[in-house]
A protein has these predicted regions:
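Conserved SAM-binding strand-loop segment of SAM-dependent methyltransferases
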Residues: 2-9
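A conserved structural/catalytic subdomain of Rossmann-like adenosyl-cofactor enzymes
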Residues: 13-15, 19-370
Length: 370
């Protein structure tokens, strides 16, 4: 009987249908509530100790690709659960409709569990459409909500594309509020939304737009800037070094430097260190890595007027305080290199993008399009 298909407990930590697949799956998961209780139910484990194959999958060469969201919001766990139960060997496959708030479509940076699930869904061409619903549709919250329409058997014309439908203003007011709920979607409005969906690329662009899957993807990459240092050596600072650290070898080398240069300010750290290395060799003082760091920390300071500091291989050292992250669209013409050339270099000509840091992320920001 149907009642035997109802299981007590949490869908997340106690899967009542571990081997079943379904034609249709509807879900209205909780918004923005902690799911710490699930960790306790799993055996009082930590988030990074989850091994459930619904939420930790093999993808993109990673045997432990995580679809696990932040502990404060379980919505994407419910979506991942349903995706794991899609029929893959039938002509019609499966269809999922879920109601989510805005966090599931846009929060979570590249590489996070939430973004990873969006990436998995979109790169596997499972996302057919997202429908923005009116605000104040629910009794206990006025927040914006969205329908995810997911299927593994798209029509040919929809393959490789995602439809965004903005139905946020398609609503009828209630004569009397019911909690936060002050509007509804009538059968007539429901028909209007369905017609927008069916019209697909021919739908009114005020309410519906269609994009390639890659439109919503981006590289999150680190933009580095070089370290620039000013060096200031004086007899007073050398004496301060002597009193604090009592390294007579370094003091001897620095005193020789002052004899040659006087109390001096240099904006070329590499030239300064070459001079120090030459003096230390003449004095028979071994310039260890520890002593080099001591001199650098004690006598140099970041200064944008300084020359670029080079490492032992002659490559620019990065200034960690100037490190930034840039989102580069997957569809940007000429890719990461072109983005740096056109969008970053004109303003930061000494910068460079660390390509090894690039991580693919996906987000669906309705406000960008409507």
């Amino acid at each position: 009987t149907q009642v035997n298909n109802i299981f007590f407990g949490s869908t997340i930590s106690n899967d009542g249908f571990p081997k079943d697949e379904f034609d249709f799956m509807l879900s209205n998961p909780p918004f923005g509530t902690s799911w710490k209780a699930e960790l306790k139910a799993w055996g009082d484990i930590k988030k990074d100790e989850i091994t459930d194959s619904r939420f930790l999958i093999e993808y993109d060469g990673n045997p432990e690709y995580s679809l696990i969201p932040d502990i404060g919001d379980p919505q994407m766990l419910f979506l991942a659960n349903n995706i794991s139960k899609m029929k893959r060997s039938t002509d019609l496959g499966s269809r999922i409709i879920e109601v989510h708030n805005s966090s599931s479509i846009s929060t979570g940076g590249a590489g996070s569990g939430t973004s990873n699930l969006r990436r998995f869904i979109i790169e596997n061409d499972l996302l057919e459409a997202i429908v923005a619903l009116p605000q104040n549709m629910f009794y206990n919250t006025g927040i914006s909500t969205y329908l995810w329409i997911v299927t593994n058997k798209k029509e040919d014309k929809r393959k490789g594309y995602i439809q965004l439908i903005d139905a946020s203003e398609l609503k009828a007011s209630l004569r009397k509020n019911v909690g936060e709920k002050n509007c509804e979607i009538t059968p007539k409005i429901r028909r209007q939304i369905i017609d927008l969906y069916l019209a697909y690329k021919d739908a009114d662009s005020k309410y519906s737009m269609v994009f390639k899957n890659e439109e919503f993807g981006y590289y999150s990459a680190t933009v580095n800037r070089p370290l620039r240092l000013k060096v200031e050596v004086s007899t007073d600072r050398i004496e301060l070094l002597r009193n604090q650290l009592k390294d007579e070898g370094v003091v001897e080398v620095l005193n020789k430097y002052c004899e040659d240069q006087g109390d001096a300010i240099s904006y070329d750290f590499n030239d300064f260190m070459e001079h120090i290395t030459h003096i230390s060799a003449k004095c028979g003082v071994k310039l260890t890595a520890k002593r080099k760091k001591l001199i650098r920390d004690f006598f140099s300071a970041v200064d944008e007027k300084g020359s670029i500091v080079l490492d032992a291989k002659g490559q620019p050292e990065l200034d960690k305080n100037l490190k930034d992250t840039e989102k580069i669209p997957l569809l940007y013409e000429s890719g990461i290199d072109g983005y740096w050339e056109n969008e970053i270099r004109p303003y930061l000509p000494d910068s460079w993008i660390d390509k090894e840091s690039a991580v693919i992320g996906y987000e669906l920001r309705f406000m960008k399009y409507f």
